[in-house]
Amino acid sequence: MTRDLTVGSPIKLIISFALPMIMGNLFQQMYNVVDTIVVGQFVGKNALASVSSAYTIMVFITSIIIGLCMGAAILWAQLFGAGDYKQLKRALTTSGIFIIIVTFCMMLLSLVGIEYILRFMNIPYELYADTKMYLQIIFCGLIFTFLYNIVASLLRALGDSKTPLYFLVLSAMLNIILDILFVLGLEWGVKGVAVATFIAQGIAAILCLLYAYKHYEILHITKKEFIFDISLFKVIAKYSILTSIQQSIMNFGILLVQGLVNSFGTVAMAAFGAAVKIEGFAYMPVQDFGNAFATYVAQNKGAQKASRIQEGVKCVVKLSSFFCVIISAVVFIGAKELMLIFISSSEYEVLNIGIEYLRVIAPFYVLIGFLFMFYGLYRGLGTMKLSIILTIISLGTRVILAYVLARIEYIGLIGIWWAVPIGWALADGVGYKFYSQIKKRTLNL
């Protein structure tokens, strides 16, 4: 069912639209989290480190595809908000052709260049074989990543954030069952969790496409309507490539930090891998408030309702602040209990490093909440360059400070942790300055 976000209470619309996205993101995170828990508890520390490092690489590669879909969805939402369904169909076919070509290129390049990727990441020798095998299987499933995300992005652009959730729930449940079967039953180890993820993602992608085609007339595209529109492609390429650059810069920065952590050994890798999973869950609600806000802004821009965009900014700031205060307290106080989900209590060093990371980062979640709001605002307005600038400031600060501080003998790992909130704070300051400038010309949005 489509939803018009240009009428009604902004705060109610954003919450109701974001909740299914939060649940969907929760279950999407479950793919690797379940893999991490299973290998951490039943295979061992080295397997946990392998899957954690592989996950960082996987997220970087898939973020390019996801970014392309998210960028194209901004144009789809604007056309839907304007009621221009003929152009919307043209935009869909043009986007689909463009993104699937990029996906196949990414799949081939990733498989061919996997050795270079692993060397760049400083993967220790004892983890090399498992990490390589995990990634090879995951890279073969990039076509499913494309398929699911382009359909899910379309449905969200039309105001339907529930349907993608249902298929992610199904897929996550299947992933858990297959993890248990392949790892505990067949004793396949790291290979087992990779195969489970591949199968589960494939089923979710295919079923989501079939359901959407059956229930959404906009997907019933005839041969005559199947057009690659050059003029639309220029707009789509601008939105998609800029959003993809933002996503890939974000994850490339994390990739560089992961490489730095890897240089501290397997214990640090395992701790960082588990702590980052917890962190991902912690700020997931505010991330999806930002994603929901992007669709809200795009539809209202298409409908030329600038005042509602300003109302939406105030709503998202309040929502993000409320959630971040609660989540920060939970993570800070429960850091040890959260780490024990991923690693055995006998791994004292791993536990202590992970707890330290979480207690440094947790008090500052409100900063990342505001940053996601700015990302959503500028993406929805179609000013993706501003989002890229904020991402470069945030991640650039984090990476540079991490490499500088980590090399100081009496600081070490904790310097990597403190670089994170400093990067968030600087990006928020610049983001607010951009917003102040845009507010002055709001009526021209």
Residue spans for each PLM region:
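Small-residue-rich hydrophobic transmembrane alpha-helices
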Residues: 48-108, 145-164, 271-335, 368-382, ...
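Residue-level signal for short hydrophobic patches within transmembrane helices
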Residues: 7, 11-30, 34, 57, ...
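Transmembrane helical elements of multi-pass membrane transporters/channels
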Residues: 16-35, 137, 148, 171, ...
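Short runs within selected transmembrane alpha-helices of multi-pass transporters and secretion channels
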Residues: 69, 138-156, 164-172, 193-206, ...
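Small-residue hotspots at the loop-to-helix junctions and early N-terminal turns
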Residues: 45-56, 135, 194, 266-281, ...
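Helix-terminus/linker motif at the lipid-water interface of multi-pass membrane proteins
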Residues: 26, 30-48, 118-125, 181-188, ...
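Short alpha-helical transmembrane segments in multi-pass integral membrane proteins
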Residues: 1-18, 76-141, 187-241, 297-364, ...
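Generic alpha-helical transmembrane segments of integral inner-membrane proteins
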Residues: 22, 26, 30, 34, ...
